Swiss-Prot record:
The gene is gppA. The lineage of its organism: Bacteria, Pseudomonadati, Pseudomonadota, Gammaproteobacteria, Aeromonadales. Catalyzes the conversion of pppGpp to ppGpp. Guanosine pentaphosphate (pppGpp) is a cytoplasmic signaling molecule which together with ppGpp controls the 'stringent response', an adaptive process that allows bacteria to respond to amino acid starvation, resulting in the coordinated regulation of numerous cellular activities. GO terms for biological process: guanosine pentaphosphate catabolic process; guanosine tetraphosphate biosynthetic process; nucleobase-containing small molecule interconversion. Belongs to the GppA/Ppx family. GppA subfamily. This is Guanosine-5'-triphosphate,3'-diphosphate pyrophosphatase.
Length: 496
């Protein structure tokens, strides 16, 4: 593993410069280094689109930090790109000359279309989703909108608006008033109207955001006890909170990091305009974007599968799990889910996939030790990078693994934000029964079964005589029935 090569992607953005260094491990990327520095290059553009000397100096100083890390990476494994501000700057050659000398590496100024396409590449690798997917990336001086399916981008645009330019244009004096927000939103809508109909006509099933603005929003949502899905009412509520602060230098929102304060109102205004213009219902945070797209472009890997499947396969390989047994538990859990879904109104979109991955990864805690394997499994999931899984999905997965056996621990099931607490508890009940039915660990030993539910009441029916012939599993099922009844959930075990 230690001999696998390093890869690096550097994004010279309009607000921040970012460096990502990774290596490939067990078919997945492992982050080795992430460095971000706020440069605010776009703030250094004058009316003639010339970069100020001060802005260029900030950029060069940042690249001196990056250059040390690049010395250990083969040149063919490095890609450095500049985006919107460097596309606009009329004196870009002056900046690039010194920047390339400092880095000892060439820098590409990519077009807005290529930036949008690469962002989509990064999202398709690191975020799960079926059907058409709308990707939104609000940068410092441009906003990319892409609709695609799997790895194919179908419609893409790079629009001339960003959180730094909108800050300068609409919040430059630091006033956070309703009038200023209305002005900023209206200006963003004017830009969007040129392309909006194309997006509405093509349509999308899921929407993900790939920018610092959306990252900040999710941090705020979680800190304020809300679900991770971004909606227009939540955005409008946050706008109200910002307006109540009055001034940019007095802005305080629970969960908003200090480094994001300055450009948050302008990014929020742009996002509200996008939601209102396109009619977006909800959005979640993407797992990656431009830098990840650059890395996967260097690797040249085929990725026509769910990002979460790649992550699960990587973890199965890395922790040497019994894949055949894991798949048997998965199939049993999904069969149980399908039987109970109508009565329990379980979420096919949000609940079933995470139940599948919980079944596949249920033995991951055994790599530490058996007695506390469920706790170890939850700890691993909580603390490991899992491309394709949102933070709320990871919390649900962790909660299910924590509750796979022994006494129920309800708090993590109720606190996750991917599904309701009641649904999470019901998924845990399903997983526990599936694990017991699969205890023999060999093909053909899982019995036919029927699960029926009436509110919290659950009945498991097995073939006649099966319980007498399978003493261990019968005993474990009876213990499980007792545990679930103890929680106030009527549970029965029958034969027919």
């Amino acid at each position: 593993m230690h001999n696998s090569p390093l890869y690096a992607a550097i994004d010279l953005g309009s607000n921040s410069f970012h460096m990502l260094v990774v290596r490939e491990v067990a078919g997945a990327l492992r982050t080795v280094t992430k460095v971000k520095r706020k440069v605010r290059l776009a703030a250094g553009l004058d009316p003639e689109f010339r970069l100020s000397r001060a802005a260029m100096e900030r950029g060069w100083d940042c690249l001196r930090l990056f250059s040390e890390q690049l010395q250990d990476i083969p040149a063919d494994n490095i890609r450095v790109v500049g985006t919107a501000t460097l596309r606009l700057a009329t004196n870009v050659d002056e900046f690039l000359s010194e920047a390339e000398r400092v880095l000892n590496h060439s820098i590409e100024i990519i077009s807005g279309e290529e930036e949008a396409k690469t962002i989509y590449e990064g999202v398709s690798w690191t975020s799960a989703g079926e059907g058409n997917r709308l990707v939104i990336d609000i940068g410092g001086a441009s906003t990319e909108l892409v609709i695609g399916e799997h790895s194919e981008a179908k419609l893409l645009n790079s629009l001339h608006m960003g959180c730094v330019t909108w800050l300068n244009n609409h919040f430059g004096d630091g006033e956070l008033s309703e009038a200023r927000f209305k002005q900023a939103i209206a200006a963003a809508k004017a830009v969007l109207e040129k392309v909006a109909e194309d997006y509405r006509a093509l349509g999308w099933r899921t929407c993900v955001g790939a920018s610092g603005t959306v990252q900040a929003l999710q941090e705020i949502m979680l800190a304020q006890g809300k679900s991770e899905r971004v909606t227009l009412p939540k955005l409008q509520e946050l706008m109200g909170q910002a307006i109540a602060c009055g001034k940019l230098d007095q802005l305080q929102l629970e969960g908003l990091a200090a480094e994001r304060l300055t450009v948050f109102p302008s990014g929020l205004a742009i996002l509200i305009a996008i939601f209102e213009t396109l009619g977006i219902e909800s959005m979640t945070l993407a797992g990656g974007a431009l830098r990840e797209g650059l890395i996967y472009g260097l690797l040249g890997n085929n990725h026509d599968c769910d990002a979460r499947d790649r992550t699960a396969d990587s973890l199965i390989n890395r922790y040497q799990l019994d894949k055949e047994h894991a798949e048997r538990v998965r199939d049993t859990a999904v069969e149980a889910f399908n039987q109970l879904q109508p009565a329990w109104r379980l979420s096919k979109r949000y609940g079933r996939p995470i139940l599948r991955y919980a079944a596949l990864l249920h033995e991951i805690g055994l790599c530490i030790e058996y007695k506390k394997a469920p706790q170890h499994a939850a700890y691993i999931i909580d603390n490991i990078d899992m491309p394709g899984f949102t933070p709320a999905q990871k919390k649900l997965l962790s909660a299910l693994l924590f509750n796979q056996r022994d006494e129920f621990k309800l708090e993590p099931l109720e606190k996750q934000g991917a599904v309701t607490g009641r649904q999470a508890i019901r998924l845990a009940r399903i997983l526990r029964i599936a694990l017991i039915l699969c205890m023999r660990r060999t093909q053909g030993t899982v019995p036919r079964f029927t699960l029926e539910a009436d509110e919290d009441a659950l009945t498991l029916t097995l073939p006649s005589g099966w319980l007498d012939e399978h003493y261990l599993r019968a005993s474990e099922l009876r213990f499980e029935v007792e545990r679930q009844q103890k929680m106030g959930w009527p549970t029965r075990l029958l034969e027919a």
